[in-house]
Amino acid sequence: MKYFVVALALVAAFACIAESKPAESEHELAEVEEENELADLEDAVWLEHLADLSDLEEARGFFGNTWKKIKGKADKIMLKKAVKIMVKKEGISKEEAQAKVDAMSKKQIRLYVLKYYGKKALQKASEKL
């Protein structure tokens, strides 16, 4: 259970990184530099900071691809977990559970699995108290 929560947190972190807005490119920075003529030292520092953001674009590309792979694997795992939960919870055959899960969207599958594990974690926490 602990590993599942840690994996879920990592997936959420990668999602935030992958969906962040793109940084300004070096070409756009050159245009800003020409327009503003950099009279102030503070402006020079600001533009220098923005020039470093081009490295972030490369990192975001790496994490974006990694995020897609992780998300795909997480979806497959959640699909399998949803089938197991339905078999255990509803007492139906594996084929019937698979048919029900196939009819659900990815979002519904995620919510179903997270709801199940959330209730399970809440029960364990209340037992310890």
Swiss-Prot record:
Q: State the post-translational modifications.
A: Cleavage of the propeptide depends on the processing quadruplet motif (XXXR, with at least one of X being E).
Query: GO molecular function terms here?
Result: toxin activity
* Keywords from the UniProt entry: Antibiotic, Antimicrobial, Cytolysis, Hemolysis, Secreted, Signal, Toxin
TM regions (residue ranges): none
- Propeptide section residues: 21-60
Q: Does the keyword Metal-binding apply?
A: no
Instruction: Kindly state one GO CC term assigned in the UniProt record.
Output: extracellular region
Q: Where is the signal peptide?
A: 1-20
Question: Where this protein primarily resides, as one coarse class?
Answer: secreted
Which Pfam family, an example, fits this chain? Latarcin
Q: From its record, what is one biological process in GO terms? A: defense response to Gram-positive bacterium
* Expression across tissues: Expressed by the venom gland.
What does the similarity note say? Belongs to the cationic peptide 06 (cytoinsectotoxin) family.
Role description: Insecticidal, cytolytic and antimicrobial peptide. Forms voltage-dependent, ion-permeable channels in membranes. At high concentration causes cell membrane lysis.
Name-wise, this protein is: M-zodatoxin-Lt8c
Q: Which organism is it from?
A: Lachesana tarabaevi
